[in-house]
Amino acid sequence: MSKKRLYEIAKEVGVESKVIVAKAQELGLSVKSHSSSVEEADANRITSSLKPGTAKDESKPAPKATPTPKEEKVEPKVDKASVAKSAPAKETSKAEVKEASVALKKPKSRNFKAEREARAKAEAERRKNGGGRDNRNRNQQGNDQGKRHNNDRRNQKGNGQGDHNKGNRDNSTNHDRNFQGKLRNDQNQNNRRDNARNNQAGPRIDLKARAAALKAEQNAEYSRQSETRFREEKAAEQRRAKEQEKARKEKQQVKVAVQKAAAETKPAPKPAPVAPQSAPTAQVQDTRRKKVRPNKSRDNRRVNEDGPKQTRNNKWNNQNQVRNQRNSNWNKNKNKKGKNNRGNSAPKPVTERKFHELPKEFEYTEGMTVAEIAKRIKREPAEIVKKLFMMGVMATQNQSLDGDTIELLMVDYGIEATKKEEVDNADIERFFVDEDYLNKDAMVERAPVVTIMGHVDHGKTTLLDTLRNSRVATGEAGGITQHIGAYQIEEGGKKITFLDTPGHAAFTSMRARGASVTDITVLIVAADDGVMPQTIEAINHSKAAGVPIIVAINKIDKPDANPERVIGELAEHGVISTAWGGDSEFVEISAKFGQNIEELLETILLVAEVEELKADPTVRAIGTVIEARLDKGKGAVATLLVQQGTLNVQDPIVVGNTFGRVRAMTNDLGRRIKTAGPSAPVSITGLNEAPMAGDHFAVYEDEKAARAAGEERAKRALMKQRQQTHRVSLDNLFDTLKAGEMKTVNVIIKADVQGSVEALAASLLKIDVEGVRVNVVHSAVGAINESDITLAEASDAVVIGFNVRPTPQARQQAETDEVEIRLHSIIYKVIEEIEDAMKGMLDPEFEEKIIGEAVIRETFKVSKVGTIGGFMVTNGKITRDSSARVIRDGVVIFDGKLASLKHYKDDVKEVGNAQEGGLTIENYNDIKVDDVIEAYIMEEIKR
């Protein structure tokens, strides 16, 4: 036989599992929990032993009726009221009653009017068809059995009496319909067969009632837990109240003891005899306690700390009802104003001010206010204001004081005052001059920084090309270096950093900048050219920077090379060879063929070893900007030379007047690196703007400090630029007036790197054309954009692009606005073009040229024409478009133009030498015989 678990039996019967377990234990079965198994016979015993009413209505078998042919048992049609009256009283537990009440649902409202109309219509139809009573009974019996089948699902959704009534209502409706004969006999037979099958099935489980029972059980458990939790919270609140009361009493005792001790120290007069105040005090305290609203509990009982619960007065319930009706935040405990409630609030204790000792030292800053000083020395501002008034200084607590006043005030208090040295966070130069910034114990040897200088086309880039084994020289426009480059090579296990500077005269500032950051200068002089102007300039820069010079005499492979002449010329400028007793090393090389290059590198390392070059790689990096430019995809790109410390990716950095974070870092070979030590040239991205070449940079501790320093430096630079106003004085008054009369060529300069921008602007400003000057409206790094064209159109300027190109939008806008764009890659061409433009803007200058002379031989006066002078040309020629002067006795009488010129009777353009003719002069008729006519023209002078 199969076994059943107890919870399965409970589900079938429709009761809780614990009831089945208890019943099984009463019957003597060995079970422990609802998961225990029993035999089928024991399961039937448990089911049959349950009390009536425990199982659901669906599990009860229907009473059997006497079978009749073609008829089944018919349940009588009953009403809800009759069922409620005739139903036997069942013994149910409290939980089951609660479950039934929870599961009870309100039946849906019926449309009685529609039912009456349907019944009347069906009755009329039945009478018309002549249906008999037997047919009606059969239909009713079939429908009574079918209604249970058709409404089985509907009955299962209900619970308890409500579902039973609902099924009865539906059954009565179906009965009314089938009573009219609307269901066929075959449908009735099917209904009877289904009902018979359902009656033979086992007991059903009412899931709705079961769910309601579980819900009721959960609600009961939650109510018990809530009650327990509420009581625990109430007990905790009472404990806290007791502790607070105890602490208050202890504090009161301490206060009384302190007052008593203070009274004992002072001799007090004899107190008058007074009545004991203990009883009235207790009475007052009791009165106050009565006025306080008692603690509330959830069951509307008054809770006393030392006694049982008491029933609450109806007064509080009425107040709660009024409060709920008002729906307001009414608070009964709110203190009412008035003399009757003055005793409810305890008097505030008087706080005694703590005495603070004066500090021994006081560090002040210029401009501190009285309030700030009072806060620092723990004194009232009024006290300090009083002291200042006694010293003769009228001040308020928000007034700033100077350093002398603060020191006098501190002397009066007996405090030693010292002025605080303020550190300018925006000052980058302090890192370069502060000796304490570097750790002397962490100093290590660093690579030398070598700057290659010399005249243009003397072979500087070719030497670097040979050293780096690359074709840098062929990539330069016009064969000259346009901007500075930094490279690093390795020789004998040691690194050397090279800086390449341009040799053209326009790049003076770049050469000076290179000399300021270098350790050794390699001066290249061509053996066939000798010392040139830029060679002398490089010598002066190196001497000004105090940098040792190594002379590399290049192009010794040429037939006309003369190294001895170069050595002698350099000696005249203070560069003396060690062979001649000087301190400069000379090396004869051929950069083109790589001759003596190793000797040059060894000489550089030897001089570097003598110089003892060291750096501290442990500090935050500082250094100098070698070059800066704007890249279309990367933004601002700066080439930096790290001089001290180590530069890392993501370091917050301040460069010149801008700031940023090192986003990416590449070395001279274009490879990405994460760190760069001393003497390493790197290219970084991540700056907000392109800095100026030659600016110093420093790494800060965090991005916030770097941002503050960068913004402050930019602000100061802007203020400094605005302060550079030219004031008119007696000394420069003439120059100012002359400048107002001069013509101006406005230019906008855009270049690829910052060094080229500076060099180009300086070169254009040096162009000397009398009467014309160059005005650089704007200069920047990057491509020519629309804003440049707009500015050029507004200022009537020419846009010069050096190694850059305009964007398509800028080019289209320039064509529309008729703005001229000049693109160049060689600085010579730019200077020549601007110089020609400046000369073309001058007003033309004319020079007087005498072309002929004539003598008046006869005069003729003609009406409406004037005086006609007959002349003979004595020198040169007289032309029709020439001007004429009338000279009489060596004095110019009139200067004007010829009105007509004739040879005999014909109008001619000119009359040659020794020929005769006639002429008239505009607006002059006083021509006399022997007057000399001098003919001249004005010729333009070429500049």
Curated annotation (Swiss-Prot):
CDD domains in alphabetical order: IF2_eIF5B, IF2_mtIF2_II, mtIF2_IVc
One of the record's GO molecular function terms: GTP binding
Ranges of compositional bias, category Basic and acidic residues: 69-82, 112-137, 145-155, 163-196, 224-253, 296-309
Residues annotated as binding GTP: 454-461, 500-504, 554-557
Region of interest (Disordered), residue spans: 30-357
Residue ranges, annotated region (G5): 590-592
Segments for region (G3): 500-503
Coiled-coil region(s): none
Low complexity: compositionally biased ranges: 254-266, 313-332
Keywords, alphabetical: Cytoplasm, GTP-binding, Initiation factor, Nucleotide-binding, Protein biosynthesis
One Gene Ontology cellular component: cytosol
Region (G2): 479-483
Residues covered by region (G4): 554-557
InterPro entries: EF-G-like_DII, IF2_II, IF2_N, P-loop_NTPase, Small_GTP-bd, T_Tr_GTP-bd_dom, TF_IF2_bacterial-like, TIF_IF2
Chain intervals for the UniProt region annotation (G1): 454-461
tr-type G domain mapped to chain residues: 445-614
Subcellular location per the Swiss-Prot or TrEMBL entry: Cytoplasm
Gene3D superfamilies assigned: 1.10.10.2480, P-loop containing nucleotide triphosphate hydrolases, Translation factors, Translation initiation factor IF- 2, domain 3
HAMAP family named among the record's database cross-references: IF_2_B
Sequence similarity: Belongs to the TRAFAC class translation factor GTPase superfamily. Classic translation factor GTPase family. IF-2 subfamily.
NCBIfam families named among the record's database cross-references: IF-2, small_GTP
Role summary: One of the essential components for the initiation of protein synthesis. Protects formylmethionyl-tRNA from spontaneous hydrolysis and promotes its binding to the 30S ribosomal subunits. Also involved in the hydrolysis of GTP during the formation of the 70S ribosomal complex.
Protein name: Translation initiation factor IF-2
Origin species: Streptococcus thermophilus (strain ATCC BAA-250 / LMG 18311)
Designated gene of the protein: infB
